[in-house]
């Protein structure tokens, strides 16, 4: 055994399903996780839309080491952008409504990870899905607080580059 875990996307999604997000709404559109271990304020989207986007984000890029707060931070970027972009706000709101309709209820309430995966697979070429996915690439992976959880030490250009820092010292590649 090499000390690394081999987890399939399906296994990660099933594990994520066990901790589905339950959205609560407080003053100012406060959205919190099922155990209130994280909270974010939805300023421009309603709390249910925000919470669904967090669950959708986790299902799109599942990482067992990442807490939901990292996904919520990425969704906050979309929420802020929706303030000045009415078309984006409509896209997100309508996209979540469509996802909920396809799920036969709240997408974030679907406990079967395979069903959630199938629902996302059905819309993967849609502009809504692509917008959320694209936002995650930067919103999730540019989050410096998440880097240690991925085993990434951060940028090295200001420290002489990887060649001078031991470019082969990473074990996750």
What are these regions (language model features)?
Residues 7-11, 24-63:
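C-terminal segment of N-terminal export signals and the immediately downstream linker at the start
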Residues 51, 55, 70-173:
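Mature-region segments of soluble proteins
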Residues 2-21:
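N-terminal secretory signal peptides and thylakoid transit peptides that target proteins
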Residues 3, 41, 106-107:
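Residues marking the start of alpha-helices
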């Amino acid at each position: 055994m090499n000390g690394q875990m081999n987890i399939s996307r399906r296994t990660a999604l099933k594990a994520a399903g066990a901790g589905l997000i339950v959205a609560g709404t407080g003053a100012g559109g406060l959205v919190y996780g099922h155990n209130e271990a994280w909270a974010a304020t939805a300023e421009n989207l309603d709390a249910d839309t925000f919470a669904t986007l967090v669950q959708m984000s986790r299902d799109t890029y599942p990482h067992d080491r990442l807490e939901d707060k990292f996904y919520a931070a990425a969704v906050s970027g979309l929420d802020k952008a929706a303030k000045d972009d009415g078309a984006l706000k409509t896209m997100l709101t309508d996209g979540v409504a469509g996802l909920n309709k396809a799920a036969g209820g709240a997408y974030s309430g679907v406990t079967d990870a395979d069903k959630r995966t199938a629902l996302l697979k059905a819309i993967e070429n849609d502009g809504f899905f692509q917008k959320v996915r694209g936002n995650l690439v930067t919103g999730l992976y540019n989050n410096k607080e998440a880097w240690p959880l991925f085993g990434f030490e951060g940028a090295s250009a200001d420290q002489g580059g990887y060649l001078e820092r031991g470019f082969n010292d990473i074990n996750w590649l």
